[in-house]
Regions:
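Specific register positions within alpha-helical solenoid repeats of the TPR/Sel1-like families, i.e.
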Residues: 6-7, 278, 312, 346
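Alpha-solenoid helical-repeat scaffolds
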Residues: 141-330
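Conserved small/polar residues in nucleotide/adenosyl-binding loops
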Residues: 349-351
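Non-catalytic protein-protein interaction scaffold segments in large eukaryotic complex-forming proteins
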Residues: 29, 33, 45, 49-200
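Extended alpha-helical scaffolding segments
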Residues: 1-46
Length: 351
């Protein structure tokens, strides 16, 4: 809202007053930083979806015949996949494959908070529940009126499953509703069989997964991530989404908002945001902030190295060379900078 209506906020001083009051709360600035980083991470969603569809799934299909030769999947039991009974050949088979490397990368993205579930649920948003605009941003709860007539003594397993889904930190609220309504499409007997298999062990696993994610990212970070994923689905998948301006097509450079600048214009905040842009290969966005930092810090060779790298990645070889030479003046011992300077000179000669 602050970004969409950034030109109007100055007309409402009470908004700035409210932010000033919130700024006295411990952790307020950290929360703003987290929100900004999560919006940057949301840019990766389409990339992740394409990687799944174009790389990981085809690789799994190619690997399937080889896997069945090494492992008899029909005779495989849960005990074979746990404890010290794991066949080392199976582990090496996965780790040595292209798929194994991609799955490790995929797992790291999930731990970071990336939206790895979007492609799974993109076609499961056609239930009547999602025709109601407000339902797209509702926290998942078994108290919802849609579940009122579902719980009887005969389907206690369903209630247990819903309770467990509430704690699934790796899924946003919208996807939890999608999963439930999809399962309700199954025939009663098939659904009952599935629910019975959803025993306390599965519940314990979800709880453990939740604790692991929260311990690595923090509870607040997890909630922020889930909300932004819900928001992403609304702007991309809601039946009437074309009636709204898709905020995820905007730059979302919150650090440039006048109303937020008093809280995130410090060196630490700007550096964190710029480093995250750089790590995600958004070189133009990172460069804008690095240039801003360079105005007050002309003595950091690392800063000018990064400015040079961003300019080089953006195709500005002359600008990159200038930044690298400045970095070399500050620290002539960096072999990386010397190689970059040589590379820029070589490229400029051949232009």
């Amino acid at each position: 809202t602050l970004y969409t209506y950034r030109k109007r906020t100055q007309l409402y001083p009470q908004i700035a007053d409210r932010l000033a009051a919130l700024a006295e709360t411990p952790g307020f600035i950290k929360t703003i930083r987290t929100i900004i980083l999560r919006f940057i991470l949301a840019r990766e969603t389409e990339k992740i979806t394409r990687k799944l569809q174009d790389e990981i799934i085809p690789e799994m299909l190619k690997l399937s015949p080889k896997l069945s030769k090494k492992i008899n999947l029909n005779e495989l039991t849960p005990e074979d996949l746990t404890g010290n009974e794991m066949n080392p050949e199976w582990e090496s088979f996965f780790s040595d494959s292209t798929l194994g490397k991609k799955m490790v990368e995929f797992g790291e993205l999930q731990q970071e908070g990336a939206d790895v579930m979007h492609s799974t649920f993109v076609h499961l948003k056609n239930f009547p529940f999602f025709h109601e605009l407000s339902n797209w941003l509702l926290p998942f709860t078994i108290e919802h009126s849609y579940f009122d007539d579902q719980f009887t003594p005969d389907n206690e397993a369903e209630k247990q499953m819903l309770d467990s889904m509430t704690f699934a930190a790796f899924m946003c609220n919208s996807d939890k509703y999608s999963l439930y309504f999809s399962m309700m499409q199954l025939p009663k007997e098939a659904r009952k069989m599935m629910m019975n298999q959803f025993d306390s062990q599965a519940t314990e696993m979800i709880q453990q997964n939740k604790e692991e994610l929260i311990s690595k990212r923090g509870k607040q970070d997890t909630i922020i991530g889930q909300y932004i994923q819900d928001l992403y689905r609304f702007f991309k998948l809601y039946p009437g989404h074309l009636d709204f301006t898709d905020i995820f097509t905007m730059p979302l450079d919150f650090h440039n908002l006048a109303i937020l600048r008093p809280y995130i214009s410090d060196k630490e905040s700007l550096t964190n945001i710029a480093e995250y842009y750089l790590r995600k290969n958004y070189f133009s966005d990172a460069l804008t902030i690095f240039n801003q930092l360079a105005k007050t810090d002309q003595d950091s060779d690392i800063l000018f190295q990064k400015i040079g790298y961003c300019k080089q990645m953006e195709g500005d070889l002359k600008g990159a060379l200038e930044a690298y030479l400045h970095a070399d003046l500050l620290n002539s011992e960096s072999k990386w900078v010397i190689r970059r300077i040589a590379g820029c000179y070589l490229s400029l000669i051949h232009i």
